[in-house]
From Swiss-Prot:
Listed pathway(s): Amino-acid biosynthesis; L-histidine biosynthesis; L-histidine from 5-phospho-alpha-D-ribose 1-diphosphate: step 1/9
Compartment(s) of residence: Cytoplasm
Cellular component, GO annotation: cytoplasm
PROSITE patterns listed in its UniProt record: AA_TRNA_LIGASE_II
Pfam families in UniProt: tRNA-synt_His
Function, as annotated: Required for the first step of histidine biosynthesis. May allow the feedback regulation of ATP phosphoribosyltransferase activity by histidine.
HAMAP family per UniProt: HisZ (MF_00125)
Species of provenance: Anaeromyxobacter sp. (strain Fw109-5)
Further comment: This function is generally fulfilled by the C-terminal part of HisG, which is missing in some bacteria such as this one.
Record-given protein name: ATP phosphoribosyltransferase regulatory subunit
Principal location: cytoplasm
Name of the gene encoding the protein in the UniProt record: hisZ
Keyword set, alphabetical order: Amino-acid biosynthesis, Cytoplasm, Histidine biosynthesis
Length: 343
């Protein structure tokens, strides 16, 4: 008998659901265009060396690759669109002067079976601001994301802001042994203050840094910025990261973005992001509906160094949140704090 099932982790999208995704993507592209972002259409396949150059070490296991019969080249189905845009930005400076505001939508495919029933093929829409650094660019990304979520009907979403180097500064200053550093990152990903306190007692760094280590697990929600300022006085390396977060928030609020919270213990995107990070959380979604951040080291890997920041909206999770908000879902879902993986 003919087996009509799909490969594991893949699914068909029927007309009603497809219509929801198409409508959502069109509204997002409308907002991106209003902010000056120009749309790109990119191929599904890339050379493997290009894809690998643009991914974090943790994301390399997500690459689905094969030998192209005609050329013998090893090619990959894109697991992320950002490296493709970095490749194009480096290859075509004539067509993409700096700063470049670019947007896209389309599917990405990941080799591993996703956790918690998440499909391997994910539909995204996003923006990349290439060649622009500093607080103004960080704030612009926050504003575009907030306005995009409002436009699609997720005005109740909250944008949570962090920084890739804040926790790094504390963990570096605490003086942990290499094995203990890995344990610290694992504990922080679980917001396990007790485990961090136990590690701090065995650390060899300054007293201030050791005291700050368990505090990382508490630096989210109301009062997080005030607690972070006190912590940063004990760990000078954390002060610069905190200053970048506060500058971006200040400018974003001047432009009317109020639904913002802070999580300076966020571990998403380790080894990929270099500055301000952010994620959008909406009631009813199974995970973050959007995620992004600053990745200033990526463009240099493709031969055109420069700062960059961007984000992607997960169309499936955004649709899920909208359906629950409109009462179409059968049962409520508890949103998880962390996105499923870095962009």
């Amino acid at each position: 008998m003919l087996d009509l099932s799909l490969p594991s982790g893949l699914r068909d999208l029927l007309p009603d659901h497809s219509a929801h995704l198409a409508e959502l993507s069109a509204k997002l592209q409308e907002v991106f265009s209003q902010f000056g972002y120009r749309r790109l259409f990119l191929p599904t396949l890339e050379r493997l060396d290009v894809v690998e150059r643009g991914l974090s070490a943790a994301a390399l296991a997500d690459v689905m690759k094969f030998v192209e019969p005609g050329s013998g080249e090893v090619v990959a189905i894109r697991p992320d669109i950002t490296p493709q845009i970095a490749r194009l930005y480096a290859a075509r400076p004539d067509a993409l002067p700096s700063p470049a505001r670019l947007c896209y939508d389309g599917p990405v495919l990941r080799a591993r079976e996703a956790r918690a029933g998440r499909p391997r093929e994910v539909y995204q829409a996003g923006v990349e601001l290439l060649g622009a650094g500093g607080a103004s660019a960080d704030a612009e990304a926050l504003v575009v994301l907030a306005r995009a979520l409002e436009r699609v009907g997720l005005g109740s979403a909250v944008v949570e802001v962090g920084h890739a180097r804040f926790a790094h500064a504390v963990i570096d200053a605490a003086g942990l042994a290499p094995k203990a550093r890995g344990a610290a990152w694992d504990a922080l990903s679980r917001k396990d203050e007790g485990a961090l306190a136990a590690l701090a007692r065995r650390a060899r760094g300054s007293a201030g840094a050791r005291a700050a280590l368990p505090e990382l697990a508490t630096l989210y929600g109301d009062g997080a910025l005030a607690r972070a300022r006190a912590l940063a006085r004990q760990v000078p390396g954390a002060a610069a990261a905190l200053g970048e977060v506060e500058a971006a928030l200040r400018l974003a609020r001047r432009r009317g973005v109020e639904a913002v919270s802070v999580d300076l213990g966020e571990t998403r995107g380790l080894g990929y992001y270099t500055g301000v990070t952010f994620a959008g959380y909406a009631p009813g979604a199974g995970s973050a509906v959007a995620a992004g951040g600053r990745y200033d080291e990526l463009l240099a890997r493709f031969g055109r160094p420069g700062p960059a920041i961007g984000f992607a909206v997960d169309l499936e999770f955004a649709t899920q949140a909208l359906e629950r908000a409109n009462g179409r879902a059968k049962r409520p879902a508890r949103p998880r704090r962390s996105p499923p993986r870095p962009r």
